């Protein structure tokens, strides 16, 4: 369940007369409460495969998560995957899975960019209006420096997102760029959400104020599909192997 390695799905498939018999669990599966089919990755002696399976054939348990996003736990023990359900050709499963992961990271980074910008705007407005010692707190050097760091983080994420998006659209091999973007996205979300709450003081954690919702979503996107540390570890392995 705590697996961040795309090359080694924890769900395994054993060849049977009707296809493959699966064993394992998927956690944090998204929108299975409304989906008619689930895209499942699993590994066999022949490599990684992807299959579309009808959700009414699966054991799905809804999870009560802090962000209230509709995540589910998926028990795949004993599920039979027919060969007709497999969507990849032999030997191409891992390539397709990495492509899906790349799209997911690009989408996450795009959402993160919007969240960071909104947190920056809320912070700029609040520190311009909130007064202490008869002057806006945004005029204090420490406050303005931390807000400036939020802006720098936003620009860092924006630049790397544009670069990765261009490489993806051009069909380039961008595995390392995607890992780098995942690493940067998590770090930027972590730093800006904490900075925004810090500069807001007590209002930063008030559920009546919109910043709380952005910070909660930022934490979700920081750690979903692996955190920054796992992305950095995978990137360092690729660099060590000259990939």
Language-model features: locations:
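Residue-level signal for inorganic ion chemistry
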Residues: 40, 51, 74-76, 116, ...
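Helix-biased detector of long, well-ordered alpha-helical tracts
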Residues: 75, 94-107
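Flexible, small-/acidic-enriched active-site or ligand-binding loops
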Residues: 28-29, 54-89
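Alpha-helical interface subdomain recognition
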Residues: 15-20, 102-243
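A short core secondary-structure module
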Residues: 25-58
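Short, surface-exposed charged micro-motifs
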Residues: 10-12, 19, 28
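Short beta-strand micro-motifs in enzyme catalytic cores
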Residues: 20, 38, 49, 70-74
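A gly/ser-rich beta-alpha-beta helix-loop segment of oxidoreductase catalytic cores
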Residues: 1-15
